[in-house]
Amino acid sequence: MSGSTITPWVVGNWKMNPMRANANQLIEEFKQLLQQNQIADENCHVGVAPVSIALTTVQAQLQDAARTVYTVAQDVSRVAGTGAYTGEVSAELLKDSQINFVLVGHSERRDIFGDNVEILKAKLQNALNAGMTVIYCVGESLEQREQGQAEQVVLQQICDIAPVVTAEQWQNQVVIAYEPIWAIGTGKTASPQDAQAMHAKIREGLCQLTPAGSNIAILYGGSVKAENAVELAACPDINGALVGGASLNAASFYQIVQAFAQSK
């Protein structure tokens, strides 16, 4: 079942970049592009995910943008509330700062920092219960793809979280981002045909898990660039993009937003 009627999302994941002066300049340049070439809110949801210490600064900078641009946290604690947890930022603390969106399950969190299924379920559940919208990342390694396990791995990652997501949360608070691990930061991109095939399988799996399955946005994240955005955006089950390196250039990021806003 196609998700072509879903309003697309484009989210820029800045990762551990850039320095403050460059971040300020990046936001101002992006705002100027939005002012000159406005894209209606209803045509595309747009977000940026800066480092945690810049969340409220970026949020304040975006207040006078020509359209809504959400500020997205890159991660959240597996511990809820407040307490003696040095270095942690809970979903409740994010919400208290009016940060309503968060990434959970990015492959760099899984691979570098050891976020396993139980940790990710706790992070997801805390964020959802705090009222946040979660962009939940799934994806396979090159080895898993070459062994023919890509679909099995990705669908299992989604099934793993099903016990902690309510029907209402699936409907209103969950976005899925498919990020083939082998395409992140490598310059390699799944062909639009391969990406669409995986997105269609994810859509099928979501529809089996929840009645909301046909309404959940599925983003593609794997070296999305201005040069390939139009072709990716034309795929019926690709409902947006989780953009890495290209989001650190205002013009490139704007072109990706424009591609998805004009595609649906």
UniProtKB/Swiss-Prot annotation:
Protein name listed in UniProt: Triosephosphate isomerase
Organism, scientific name: Acinetobacter baumannii (strain ATCC 17978 / DSM 105126 / CIP 53.77 / LMG 1025 / NCDC KC755 / 5377)
Q: What positions constitute the catalytic site?
A: 106, 179
Q: How does it assemble?
A: Homodimer.
**Entry binding sites for substrate:** 13-15, 185, 223, 244-245
GO biological-process terms attached to the record: gluconeogenesis; glyceraldehyde-3-phosphate biosynthetic process; glycerol catabolic process; glycolytic process
Q: What EC number is given for this enzyme?
A: 5.3.1.1
Keyword presence, Nuclease: no
Instruction: Provide this UniProt record's keywords sorted from A to Z.
Output: Cytoplasm, Gluconeogenesis, Glycolysis, Isomerase
Where in the cell does this protein reside? Cytoplasm
Q: What is its main location?
A: cytoplasm
Q: What broad class of enzyme is this?
A: isomerase
UniProt xrefs under Pfam families: TIM
Question: What pathway is it annotated to?
Answer: Carbohydrate biosynthesis; gluconeogenesis; Carbohydrate degradation; glycolysis; D-glyceraldehyde 3-phosphate from glycerone phosphate: step 1/1
| Family per similarity comment | Belongs to the triosephosphate isomerase family.
What is catalysed by this protein?
D-glyceraldehyde 3-phosphate = dihydroxyacetone phosphate
A GO MF label: triose-phosphate isomerase activity
